[in-house]
């Protein structure tokens, strides 16, 4: 707000007053701790041996096919120099014996766990 006043001598004086704008401070109420409580009718599905719908498939390579493919791809990429050809002739891959073949085991996602303490569904 501005006011002007003139004295008897002809001098003009100006008085300016400004008001500070109010500051609004907001504070949230204190929250209560959240607690989870289960009703007596809630069914425990954790230990009921239910099959999972999302099973992760992990690739189990066949025993000898992967080794043969790896060795053939590495020889294709070699250059035509005589040093590399001599090295290729001297290094031979030993054939795998069938005695060491192990039956591949399913991974942890493919096996259904066996629980000792199974919950019972009410009404059954």
Swiss-Prot record:
InterPro entries listed in its UniProt record: PPI_Ypi1 (IPR011107)
Gene Ontology molecular-function annotations: protein phosphatase 1 binding; protein serine/threonine phosphatase inhibitor activity
Basic and acidic residues bias locations: 27-37
Localization (cell): Nucleus
Primary localization: nucleus
Region (Disordered): 1-38, 62-124
Database matches in PANTHER family: E3 UBIQUITIN-PROTEIN LIGASE PPP1R11, E3 UBIQUITIN-PROTEIN LIGASE PPP1R11-RELATED
Function summary: Regulator of type 1 phosphatases which maintains protein phosphatase activity under strict control.
UniProt record similarity statement: Belongs to the YPI1 family.
Name the UniProt record assigns to this protein: Type 1 phosphatases regulator YPI1
Organism the protein comes from: Candida albicans (strain SC5314 / ATCC MYA-2876) (Yeast)
Encoding gene, per UniProt annotation: YPI1
């Amino acid at each position: 707000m501005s006011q002007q006043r003139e004295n008897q001598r002809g001098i003009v004086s100006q008085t300016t007053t400004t008001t500070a704008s109010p500051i609004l401070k907001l504070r949230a109420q204190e929250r209560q701790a959240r607690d989870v409580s289960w009703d007596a009718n809630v069914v425990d599905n954790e230990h009921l041996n239910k099959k999972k719908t999302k099973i992760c498939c992990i690739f189990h390579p066949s025993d000898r096919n992967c080794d043969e493919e790896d060795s053939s791809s590495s020889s294709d990429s070699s250059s035509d120099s005589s040093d590399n050809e001599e090295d290729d002739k001297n290094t031979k891959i030993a054939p795998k014996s069938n005695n060491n073949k192990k039956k591949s085991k399913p991974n942890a996602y493919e096996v259904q766990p066996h629980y000792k303490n199974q919950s019972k569904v009410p009404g059954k």
